[in-house]
Amino acid sequence: MAELNEILGNERIKEHFITAVRHKNISHAYIMEGDKGSGKKMLAEAFAKILQCEGREITGLVESCGKCESCIQMEHHDHPDVIWVSHEKPNVISVGEIREQIVNTVEIMPYKGPYKIYIVDEAEKMNAAAQNAILKTIEEPPEYAVIFLLTTNRGAFLDTILSRCILLATRPVPGTAVEKYLVEKCSVSKEEAEFAAGFSLGNIGKAEAIVSSEEFRDLKDLTLSILRYIHEIESYEIADKVKEYKKYKNRIDDFFDIFLMWFRDICY
């Protein structure tokens, strides 16, 4: 897992966390909003690693040491006091799941760390009953409890939850930084990196996903081959190529995004 200072972009969120650690002013509840792939999980996990680090108490630094038992457990995603809340149904987090995984366990002291940290990904999927269940914990948390609600849409939360959480929003990473990262870390060509940076609109997770996807690469090549030579090829050839899109029916949004990006580049 990445250290906080290794995460690309979102400097304001990283500085917020560093300042909170430096001044020992950790909130009990955070809402982190951003698109899928924008780094919410990485940021929450890196902050959790700093909070649980045993070596930090010795060094006095505001970053994790990477060597203590807590840091090693975080690296292996098995720290007993960092709980990722799961849900069975894909589109809803139920009141039962919130009660079982948070409400009924939060009063149990941390096993070893100074904090007991709960991370709820896709938290916008909590139904009203689940939100009301977690609200009491947010309102009256144990001193050691920290809750992260990661979401693509803060508007899905009750006003009472919004008013009691620190609100943080991820931001797009500059295109040049994304390109540099992809070339250096993912070993792709400058041309591929430039396309991925533009296509992802600064979403580093999305950019990484598309440069590593052979299916996306094939879809991109097919789409661009039509767009680049549409004025030269016959109508029956276009029809044949369109038939090839059947195997990409689950990536129709990507097709339209490639299409729009092509015309955006032409116009601007």
Question: Where is each model-derived feature located?
Answer:
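Charged, glycine-rich active-site and insertion segments that engage polyanionic ligands
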Residues: 1-50, 58, 73, 143-145, ...
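Conserved catalytic/switch belt of AAA+ P-loop NTPases
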Residues: 132-149
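A short beta-strand-to-loop transition that corresponds to the Sensor-1 phosphate-sensing loop
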Residues: 122, 149-154
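Clamp-loader machinery-focused feature within the broader ASCE/P-loop NTPase space
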Residues: 2-129
